């Protein structure tokens, strides 16, 4: 069964969301739900299909867990981890509008000389918070702190002016807690 769904795009732009299926990043669905975008969330999708889909879209939104090396996908059926977005995709992404939220995605795009809306380290789990000395949150509470960010991204994702998009997101994602403070510093425009 393929987990690729075809949707409608806004203003004649073809938008592709790459968000590998992962319960720990379900809150990220709020960024694109109801938008009618094409979505890839199948962790076993072939690299050739990913490349084909990227080539046929104008704007690429990439969400999930990752590293400076790319966006990670985990196939529960096989136990295999892989970079579903990696250095081999850089050349085709250079001609696209790119938006990403995975840990250190800004380092990936900066290394390849690409602009766009990208994140540094974003705390999305209690384990990550503890790595940065934030101990008072559990996974559920962290997911709750992220919802204003997800809703702000949902409401601004179609904006052309990325600086204005970032300004509005930071204005709306402004809770008085350590996770929010940490994450706000890592919402970047390249």
Q: Where are these predicted regions, by residue range?
A:
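Active-site-adjacent structural elements in enzyme catalytic domains
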Residues: 10-11, 93, 105
